[in-house]
């Protein structure tokens, strides 16, 4: 049948495969935090949303709520900023507030 070295080799490859899957799952689940906002106040009359979901950002980045719109920022180890919540109302690009006559 199999020699001892074949069994050890198969066991090692299974362990490595399990560790790889565990590592990938940890990275996906971790998600990261938003760093401190660079511009908490916005002087513009509109916002620019670069992201409207976490999937809009590259790996290692997270969609964060900033004063002038949502932006992808490098993940932080500590929660200092506000992370965008997937499923929240959002529109990509330039977003202008309602005109005074549209409020009711």
Swiss-Prot record:
GO CC term (a single one): extracellular region
UniProt keywords, alphabetically: Disulfide bond, Secreted, Signal, Toxin
Post-translational modification: Contains 5 disulfide bonds.
The WAP domain, residue ranges: 31-76
Signal peptide: 1-30
SUPFAM superfamilies reported in the protein's UniProt record: Elafin-like
Tissue expression per record: Expressed by the venom gland.
Disulfide bonds: 34-64, 42-68, 51-63, 52-90, 57-72
Superkingdom field: Eukaryota
Subcellular localization(s) per the UniProt record: Secreted
Gene Ontology molecular function: toxin activity
Protein role: Has antibacterial activity.
Family: Belongs to the venom protein 11 family. 02 (wap-2) subfamily.
Protein name in the entry: U20-lycotoxin-Ls1d
């Amino acid at each position: 049948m199999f020699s001892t070295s074949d069994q050890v080799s198969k066991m090692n490859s299974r362990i490595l495969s399990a560790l790889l899957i565990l590592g990938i799952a940890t990275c996906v689940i971790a998600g990261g935090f938003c760093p401190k906002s660079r511009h908490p106040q916005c002087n513009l009359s509109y916002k620019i949303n670069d992201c409207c979901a976490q999937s809009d950002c590259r790996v290692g980045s997270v969609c964060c709520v900033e004063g002038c719109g949502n932006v992808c920022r490098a993940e932080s180890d500590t929660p200092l900023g506000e992370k965008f919540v997937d499923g929240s109302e959002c529109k990509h690009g330039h977003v202008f507030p309602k005109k005074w006559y549209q409020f009711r």
